């Protein structure tokens, strides 16, 4: 994921080929203020060594940095939950999330053009509450009835159920988390990290729209959205 305008950008995660990231920003690394990483699992930090060999600063929790063991020309910058950091013109507040890894973070990111952007993935619930949100990227990984049906029909092992319940956000938890936060000024809700087999994108989008009354998107490769502070 990339938050960007004509002159600056902030990369969220680096779990895909870095060449794909560079293509998305027209190979203009000079505009990138930094790369935020939530945790050390490879689908979120696979390209970290490549990023550390560029001018792009990498930011994560101390626990994530140690677990990633990234190797490059530069060292990652450790962040602390609850402290506010200026990364370029992006104001970043890391917060703790709940996942099966060292020290996972979510991020509240504020910019004059986007307003407050909530980024929360790979967490089985959202412990914090946030005010005056403008845009939201949040995990909706599975729905319990679909997961249970897949187990009953032998499509996935039962052991995966326990791991999923303790590491990823269900549709119901996602809906409840959203409704527990201040959505009055929200322009976009983007559902991310949907399980290939344990979710239903169309039903998830409609369910969150019905619950919140907001515009809801399912994240897709190449998707471009206007994350404005105001709806116009």
Locate predicted features.
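Active-site metal-binding loops of divalent metal-dependent hydrolases
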Residues: 14-16, 40, 97-100, 121-123, ...
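Active-site environment of divalent metal-dependent phosphoester hydrolases
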Residues: 40-46, 65-67, 101-102, 126-128, ...
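Metallo-beta-lactamase
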Residues: 61-114
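Divalent metal-coordination and catalytic microenvironments
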Residues: 3, 39, 92, 99, ...
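Cap/insert and terminal regions of metallo-dependent hydrolase folds
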Residues: 131-222
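Conserved beta-strand hairpin/beta-sheet module of binuclear metal-dependent hydrolase folds
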Residues: 1-27, 105-122, 134-135, 144
């Amino acid at each position: 994921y990339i938050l960007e305008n004509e002159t600056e950008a902030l990369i969220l995660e680096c779990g895909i080929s870095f060449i794909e990231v560079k293509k998305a920003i027209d190979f203009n690394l000079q505009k990138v203020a930094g790369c935020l990483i939530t945790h050390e699992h490879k689908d979120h930090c696979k390209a970290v060594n490549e990023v550390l060999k560029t001018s792009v600063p990498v930011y994560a929790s101390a626990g994530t940095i140690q677990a990633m063991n990234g190797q490059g020309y530069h060292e990652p910058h450790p962040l602390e939950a609850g402290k506010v950091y200026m990364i370029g013109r992006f104001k970043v507040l890391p917060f703790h999330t709940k996942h099966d890894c060292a020290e996972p973070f979510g991020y509240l990111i504020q910019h004059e053009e986007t307003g407050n952007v909530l980024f929360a993935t790979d967490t089985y619930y959202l412990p914090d509450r946030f005010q005056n949100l403008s845009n939201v990227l949040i995990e909706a990984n599975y729905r319990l009835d679909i997961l249970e049906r897949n187990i009953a029909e032998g499509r996935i092992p039962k052991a995966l159920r326990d791991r999923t319940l303790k590491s990823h956000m269900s549709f119901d938890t996602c809906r409840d988390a959203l409704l527990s936060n201040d959505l009055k000024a929200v322009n976009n809700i983007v559902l991310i990290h949907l399980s290939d087999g344990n979710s239903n994108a169309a039903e998830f989008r409609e369910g969150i729209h019905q619950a919140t009354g907001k515009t809801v998107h399912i994240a897709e490769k190449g998707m471009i959205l206007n994350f404005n502070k105001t709806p116009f």
